[in-house]
């Protein structure tokens, strides 16, 4: 489902329709962010997860977790196995944007960061 009209690719996002798909045990993929400027796809993911009352956010990205600094740029980056929302924001970590983390915090949504570069992480 998409936030902007791309009828040849996917149906438009309508919350109640997405809920009905899930009730029928269908897989629903949300694409194209929120359709609004200034909101990242990370924020859109947390927003949609909140709307759908999801239990968790799974973020596939280039790195295999949260680091104290970008491991692609810094060889001495240290992996952080677990971090609170507040510490994530205070340490200015960038794997997800602050708006997404703040919204996840407000909703109590846990987030798992995993690498999409590792084929064993993709089902």
Where are the regions a protein language model picked out?
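A short acidic/basic microdomain associated with nuclease active sites
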Residues: 1-2
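Active-site phosphate/oxyanion-binding loops
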Residues: 5-27, 37-123
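Short, acidic/hydrophobic/Gly-rich beta-strand patch recurrent on exposed beta strands
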Residues: 30
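Short glycine-/small-residue-rich Rossmann-like dinucleotide-binding loops
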Residues: 33-34
């Amino acid at each position: 489902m998409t936030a902007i009209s791309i009828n040849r690719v996917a149906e438009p996002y309508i919350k109640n329709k997405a809920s009905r798909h899930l009730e029928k045990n269908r897989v629903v993929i949300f694409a194209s962010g929120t359709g609004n400027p200034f909101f990242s796809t990370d924020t859109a993911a947390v927003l949609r997860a909140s709307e759908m009352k999801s239990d968790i956010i799974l973020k596939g990205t280039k790195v295999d977790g949260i680091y104290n600094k970008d491991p692609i740029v810094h060889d001495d980056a240290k992996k952080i196995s677990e971090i609170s929302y507040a510490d994530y924001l205070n340490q200015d970590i960038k794997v997800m944007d602050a708006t997404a983390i703040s919204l996840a915090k407000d909703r109590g949504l846990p987030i798992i960061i995993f690498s999409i570069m590792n084929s064993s992480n993709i089902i």
